[in-house]
Amino acid sequence: MGKVLIVIDMQNDFVTGTLGNKEAQAIVLNVQAKVKEYADRGDWIIFTRDTHEKNYLDTPEGKKLPAKHCINGTEGWQIVPELEVENCEYVDKPTFGWLNWEGFESNDEIELVGVYTDICVVSNALILKAKYPEAIISVDVSCCAGVTPEKQAAALETMKSCQIDVYRQEQ
């Protein structure tokens, strides 16, 4: 059984940039501690990066969320510097959820943290649960932020309903 940490979209634009909020800023130290915990054990760490091109505003998503963000190669697209570690992997995803998760075993423990709980975290948690129904999928609330506290609460309830283990690690 392996342990995997997936850090969802902890990018500059979602923390301090175009779409950042105080909730996202408040979890950076918790996520940093979580990444260090996994790195110290030599566990598998994957960072996802929301990745858009310069024509983002012309896309269906860009028309519904007309805020240019996470444009490939820009400063806003980069992972928050405090979180970078060696021996990690990156997944550049063009939308909320990544459909091509591979390499996990049915008995793995897969933990998700990051932003935004009500968009990309919930999307990826549910995709992983559908693809690996026997894996233990968990979300640490102390390392997640929603667009709003209300939307985060709704997403957490949805994940609990779908047998995602939602917990809060004391820091």
Name the predicted role of every residue range.
Residues 1-90, 136-138, 147-160, 165-168:
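Active-site acidic carboxylates
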Residues 33-37, 120-132:
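Histidine-anchored nucleotide/phosphate-binding helix
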Residues 114-123, 138-149:
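Phosphate/ribose-phosphate-bearing ligand recognition and processing surfaces
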